[in-house]
């Protein structure tokens, strides 16, 4: 497996600063994110995106996956048809940017019933979210296939697709090799176990986030450093070997440290080496 890290794990700075730190800490690649503004955004030109790719290439780093900070603002399941259209347009641009960066996967939040930390006033019925999300992803499927970039649906605290069996069946119903799971092992622990998700989703897993979570803490405060929480990483690794997973695993460390913020990158790299059996 290849060891990467998500860009949101880094202290504030430029993309170049983050890539340099990732390289120094021993990562093989970085998962970047599109934003509304900034160096890499929905407004970035193809030329600007290719310059980011060259920067990473020059450092010997892969840009293997692309997420987007606007996924909670523009939702495939929104009550407003105009917002659903914006969500589809955003995902199309995310696919295009991923192709330019050399990434083979984008992270997508499949739909949102409700979420406490972003627009908590919005609540959409579960069956309606299912219908709208399925419709939107079905429309996006041919575009992903034409670019050769996969859409990875993340299990996240969106009160939707709450079990690995439901995620599996949703993916299978979409019927494309270019739509699969972006499995976040830490996000599963509030109601299930990541090793079950791994074994049930199997070949449908496109990419994986490594996080850790302390169940007794609860809420967003439960997220802790790798190996400091309740994720049974030895069992997760056994499950990954069983299904033959040999793709990227990305540390996603949120929140960052308050002081000596670069230390989280080095600590995460070491913990991932231990988890992966490199040390």
Labelled PLM ranges:
Residues 1-4, 11-28, 57, 102, ...:
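Histidine-acidic metal/acid-base catalytic patches
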Residues 1-6, 64-76, 112-121:
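N-terminal small/glycine-rich loop or linker at the start of catalytic domains
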Residues 16-17, 55-59, 76-180, 190:
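Active-site acidic/histidine proton-transfer and metal-coordination neighborhood
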Residues 25-36, 65-73, 110:
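Short, conserved active-site loops that position catalytic residues or coordinate cofactors/metal ions
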Residues 31, 65, 107, 152, ...:
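Conserved beta-strand positions in the central sheet of alpha/beta enzyme cores
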Residues 33-53, 110-117:
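Glycine-rich, proline-tolerant flexible connector loops at the mouths of alpha/beta enzymes
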Residues 36-40, 72-78, 114-119, 190-191, ...:
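A short acidic, helix-capping loop that chelates divalent metal ions and anchors anionic groups
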Residues 39-41, 80-83, 123-124, 221-227:
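Short glycine-enriched, charge-decorated loop/helix-capping segments at active-site entrances
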């Amino acid at each position: 497996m290849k060891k990467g890290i998500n860009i949101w794990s880094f202290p504030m700075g430029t993309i170049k600063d983050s890539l340099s730190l990732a390289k120094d800490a021993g990562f093989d690649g970085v998962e970047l994110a599109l934003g509304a503004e900034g160096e890499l955004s929905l407004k970035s030109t193809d030329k600007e995106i290719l310059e980011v790719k060259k920067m990473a290439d020059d450092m010997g780093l892969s840009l293997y996956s692309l997420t987007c900070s606007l996924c909670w603002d523009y939702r495939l399941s929104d009550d407003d048809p105009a917002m659903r259209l914006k969500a589809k347009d955003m995902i199309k641009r995310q696919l295009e940017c991923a192709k330019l960066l050399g990434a083979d996967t984008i992270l997508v939040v499949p739909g949102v019933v409700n979420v406490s930390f972003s627009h908590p006033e919005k609540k959409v019925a579960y069956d309606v979210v299912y219908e709208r999300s399925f419709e939107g992803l079905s429309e996006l499927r041919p575009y992903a296939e034409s670019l050769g970039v996969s859409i990875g649906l993340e299990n996240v605290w969106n009160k939707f697709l709450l079990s690995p069996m439901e995620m599996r069946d949703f993916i299978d119903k979409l019927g494309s090799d270019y739509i699969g799971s972006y499995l976040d092992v830490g996000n599963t622990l509030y109601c299930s176990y990541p090793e079950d998700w791994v074994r049930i989703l199997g070949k449908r897993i496109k990419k994986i986030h490594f996080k850790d979570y302390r169940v007794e803490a609860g809420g967003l405060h439960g997220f802790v450093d790798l190996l400091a929480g309740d994720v049974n990483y030895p069992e997760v690794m056994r499950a990954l070997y069983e299904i033959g997973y040999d793709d990227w695993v990305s540390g996603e460390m949120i929140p960052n440290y308050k002081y000596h913020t670069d230390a989280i990158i080095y600590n995460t790299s070491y913990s991932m080496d231990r988890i992966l059996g490199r040390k």
